[in-house]
Amino acid sequence: MEFVFLGTGAGVPSKGRNVSAIALQLLEERGGTWLFDCGEATQHQILHTSVRPRRIEKIFITHLHGDHIFGLPGLLGSRSFQGGTTPLTVYGPKGIEQFIEVALSVSTTHVKYPLEIVEITEEGIVFEDKQFYVETKRLSHGIECFGYRIVEKDIQGPLLVEKLREANVKPGPIFKRLKDGEIVELEDGRVLDGKDFIGPPQKGRIITILGDTRYCDASRILAQDADVLVHEATFAAADQTQAHDYFHSTTEQAARIALEANVKRLILTHISSRYQGDMYKELLREAKAVFAHTEIAMDLKSFPVER
């Protein structure tokens, strides 16, 4: 599991930062990639990374401001030309379906793969399978905006092969049955319960990715005990009034959420273009003064998510 930040700027692109897009690479876990937001030129940024559009299986849109969605029609269209044939699902607030359908229709763009659009109308779980579930809550922004909590379900512990050997159980198909938790009768009449030969489960990881937001309770709830929190930090601490007026957060406010939610690691993104060059170092210093385990995202930078 790995983050690839495709765009870390706010509002408009700058020379150093493109607008919002984050790829969550799940290649080892499920052979695919999830994209969070898709600002203008996202597909161009992808060209400089290991992300493959044909492997993108889900796109989660936080809200419908242009710096988070204007790259979506182009990416959806190009995916067809880049070998994308597998289904793709787009999740987002009410209006995302109309935006996509109008953009593709007016430009006579035809996708050659199954495309599903899910409009989020209620808070709660928007996706779940055997590996993950994704939960969402409304944040505090000028328009409807969601944050996403991605929870990896606990992974079954390993088969205790040495314990089986000590019990004089020979390798073979029986190992798989025991690993599947079956109760198995051996040729000598012994009955083994697979659960007795499986190690403790490996705890799944929790990732929280927030859209644009003021400091709010929903952010803290979504981030509770997360391994990684990705939080916007549009403004420096001194610009708190502007942050509030424009429905955004400061570096210190993002760090406070991380501290209050007991997260392990905070990554700041959505940095205003007013902070150029090495000014990001001061933003990072402000956040670290509140929450030590803070990093700041840069375009095309990768962050592995450790267990």
Curated annotation (Swiss-Prot):
It catalyses: Endonucleolytic cleavage of RNA, removing extra 3' nucleotides from tRNA precursor, generating 3' termini of tRNAs. A 3'-hydroxy group is left at the tRNA terminus and a 5'-phosphoryl group is left at the trailer molecule. Zn(2+) 2 binds at residues 67-68, 212, 270. It holds the Pfam family Lactamase_B. One of its GO terms (molecular function) is zinc ion binding. Keywords: Endonuclease, Hydrolase, Metal-binding, Nuclease, tRNA processing, Zinc. SMART domains: Lactamase_B. InterPro entries: Metallo-B-lactamas, RibonucZ/Hydroxyglut_hydro, RNase_Z/BN. Zn(2+) 1 binds at residues 63, 65, 141, 212. Its cofactor is Zn(2+). Signal peptide: none annotated. The active site is at 67 (proton acceptor). Coiled coil: none annotated. PANTHER family: ZINC PHOSPHODIESTERASE ELAC PROTEIN 1. Belongs to the RNase Z family. This is Ribonuclease Z. It comes from Bacillus cytotoxicus (strain DSM 22905 / CIP 110041 / 391-98 / NVH 391-98).
